[in-house]
């Protein structure tokens, strides 16, 4: 995919059905990694929730679209104000979800979405960007490391 054939923009209500399709794709990746946690063929967000999220001031939903207007990927991010007695106060962006259609992965779509999110975070005065990646999702871990992300903390679990 050529970079000039791709546009990254804020999501619109008309994009929701395609976003839901892509949410199903990413859920199925997670379900393969952790069938004990994820149900097959479900989505993290339903269409009404995405519609509501589009109106929130602390939520950023980006889509990458091809020349024909087909949504090839999305990025959900939330803006947070970090405060605490022992924490440096700052604004932060948390990338909640990023998905590229399986048919066009490794073609620069994810990179373009991430670059736009970084630009957006800078314009909004964020000091950092955080995200979570499921253990075993080596493609995602490699992608984020190659784009400057490094471990900040570890979440450990003990199955009972």
Q: Which residue ranges define each predicted feature?
A:
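Conserved beta-strand in the GNAT
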Residues: 63, 70-79, 94, 99
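Conserved acetyl-CoA-binding loop-helix of GNAT-fold acetyltransferases
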Residues: 97-100, 106-119, 146
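Conserved active-site alpha-helix within GNAT-family acetyltransferase domains
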Residues: 111, 115, 123, 135-153, ...
């Amino acid at each position: 995919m050529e970079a000039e054939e791709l546009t990254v923009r804020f999501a619109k209500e008309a994009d929701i059905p395609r976003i839901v399709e892509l949410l199903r794709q990413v859920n199925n990746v997670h379900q393969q990694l952790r069938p004990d946690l994820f149900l097959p063929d479900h989505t993290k967000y339903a269409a009404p929730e995405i519609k509501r999220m589009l109106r929130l001031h602390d939520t950023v939903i980006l889509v990458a679209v091809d020349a024909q207007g087909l949504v090839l990927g999305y990025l959900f991010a939330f803006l947070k104000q970090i405060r605490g007695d022992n924490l440096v106060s700052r604004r932060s962006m948390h990338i909640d979800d990023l998905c590229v259609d399986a048919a066009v992965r490794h073609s620069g779509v994810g990179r373009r979405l991430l670059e736009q999110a970084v630009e957006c975070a800078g314009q909004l005065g964020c000091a950092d960007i955080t995200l979570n990646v499921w253990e075993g999702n080596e493609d995602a871990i490699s992608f984020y490391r190659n784009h400057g992300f490094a471990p900040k903390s570890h979440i450990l679990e003990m199955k009972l």
